[in-house]
């Protein structure tokens, strides 16, 4: 810390496990959150690691993808992984025995939203009039397009990319456009691109960690049955 110029005073007073009780809920806080005063407060953990635990991951080899604006995919294992493109930390359960390694794709749910906001005015108007989700309408059209989007390929690096590329200057690309392609083709290719980004992370991990099946997915992406099927097809794994 001296070499990096970080004052020791900024560090926590002590290191604790995620399950350690570090305090009690005050009366004021209890009123705000609807819990009892004095409720034990645990140290907790990083957001996606706790989401992994909440998905029921307790054993080595189990893995979860948290898919919202971006992707965070992580696996529980023992020992240090061979692939150093992943980020590794103690797992929230049995932290002395188990590790959690993860990689992330920067752009996931942000891509369908970008497409909808810029190219789906008709679907948004229908949503306002009928209450039907504009994303659901886009899914219906994209489901009619064959896997592979008739040769259309999207690289989903619209906000740079994290694991395993780690390049903030990577940029999104739409390849193979022809006059045959429609809006539905582009939307499906976007969904497929995120699935392949997840597969890229998983394949980078498989060099040193034995992965189990299925892959559990949590987050907003799970609202789309089409997208979940695309993930299953691309990963070759039950979801």
Predicted region positions:
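A conserved active-site cap/scaffold subdomain adjacent to cofactor or substrate pockets
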Residues: 96-123
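Alpha-helical hydrophobic/aromatic positions enriched in membrane-embedded helices and signal peptides
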Residues: 38-39, 60, 101, 184, ...
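Short glycine/serine/threonine-biased micro-segments
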Residues: 42, 59, 66-67, 95, ...
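Short, well-ordered loop/turn and helix-capping segments at boundaries between secondary-structure elements
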Residues: 58-59, 79, 117-124, 196, ...
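ATP-dependent carbohydrate kinase catalytic cores
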Residues: 1-96, 106, 123, 129-136, ...
